[in-house]
């Protein structure tokens, strides 16, 4: 299956699951293919045949954007270089959760999150340690008795009851012994932080020198500006005094390629519940494109009042619907 067909299939699946899905980010640079929202769950999805194609820089950008937009970065893919991704298992690449399409269907359509995650050494599950302790005590078993049944040490059983994760083999043994599942679902839509072994969110990239003057003006106007490296927009700007607070921010000469980015920003903004603004090097005869505000750098330079800048963006940029 081609990557384009895979993206179309995943998009259709999400729409069937009542997600609002953005237009595909068919521009470069980019770190994700589509944004999708259902209620308060916002996902930034990268869709790949081979998930090993996700490099460290893209993974870092996805995690930063997830933090800026209050979204979950996620990869849906088919295989690694060595094997097919297993259904019902969460993998990780550069701190980003990775699942296959079958797992995605179970999660998004059926509402069944995966129970298993991959980590160095094999496949693991999160155990409900309190439930395990209750069941063991109700049966009148000591730590030693359960340790003998499992073929592990008393210390290991004690750690399981304190919340240590277990191999899938141990989880199956426990279920067979007690006729009770002890596995806790992996909260993929919250980033799987409880099982993800990753560094803190990577620091922001350096601002492109070509964009410094625009982002500097926004900073002086009271925005908190987060530069991006691999997105259809140059920054995510936050204005805590507005609703919505976040503004997808672009800047360049307004070429046909830039107009395409502006339209994609509008689509992403509708899903992510942000406004979007594109700062142009020349004056344009339009004030917006598909809801993305167009503001020339000359106009920006003529406004000395920070509130005037915020008002201009609010007036020209379409506010996203809450649907």
Swiss-Prot record:
DNA-binding region: 143-162
Protein known as: Putative HTH-type transcriptional regulatory protein Hlac_0273
Family annotation (Pfam families): HTH_3
Keyword DNA-binding: yes
The HTH cro/C1-type domain, residue ranges: 132-189
InterPro entries reported for this sequence: Arc_TR_HTH, Cro/C1-type_HTH, Lambda_DNA-bd_dom_sf
GO MF term (any one): DNA binding
Organism the protein comes from: Halorubrum lacusprofundi (strain ATCC 49239 / DSM 5036 / JCM 8891 / ACAM 34)
Keywords annotated in UniProt: DNA-binding, Transcription, Transcription regulation
Residue ranges, annotated region (Disordered): 188-211
């Amino acid at each position: 299956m081609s990557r384009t067909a895979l993206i179309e299939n995943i998009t259709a699946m999400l729409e069937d699951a009542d997600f609002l899905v953005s237009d595909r980010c068919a521009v470069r640079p980019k770190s994700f293919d589509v944004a999708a929202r259902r209620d308060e769950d916002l996902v930034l999805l990268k869709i790949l045949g081979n998930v090993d194609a996700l490099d460290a820089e893209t993974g870092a950008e996805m995690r930063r954007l997830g933090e800026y937009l209050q979204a979950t970065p996620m990869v849906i893919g088919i295989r690694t270089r060595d094997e097919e991704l297993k259904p019902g298992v969460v993998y990780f690449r550069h701190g980003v959760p990775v699942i296959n399409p079958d797992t995605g269907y179970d999660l998004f359509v059926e509402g069944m999150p995966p129970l298993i995650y991959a980590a160095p050494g094999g496949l693991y599950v999160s155990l409900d340690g309190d439930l395990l302790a209750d069941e063991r005590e109700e049966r009148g078993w000591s730590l030693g008795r359960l340790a003998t049944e499992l073929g592990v040490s008393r210390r290991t059983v004690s750690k399981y009851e304190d919340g240590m994760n277990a191999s899938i083999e141990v989880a199956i043994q426990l279920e067979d012994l007690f006729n009770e599942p002890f596995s806790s679902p992996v909260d993929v839509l919250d980033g799987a932080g409880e099982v993800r072994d990753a560094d803190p969110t990577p620091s922001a990239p350096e601002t492109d020198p070509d964009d410094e003057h625009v982002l500097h003006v926004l900073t002086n106007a009271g925005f908190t500006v987060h530069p991006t490296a691999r997105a259809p927009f140059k920054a995510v700007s936050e204005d805590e005094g507005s609703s919505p607070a976040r503004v997808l921010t672009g800047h360049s000469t307004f070429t046909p390629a830039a107009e395409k980015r502006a339209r994609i920003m509008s689509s992403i903004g509708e899903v992510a519940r942000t406004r979007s603004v594109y700062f142009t090097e020349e004056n344009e005869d339009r004030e917006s494109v598909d809801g993305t505000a167009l503001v020339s750098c000359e106009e920006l330079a003529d406004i000395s009042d920070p509130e005037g800048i915020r008002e201009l963006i609010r007036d020209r940029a379409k506010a996203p619907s809450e649907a």
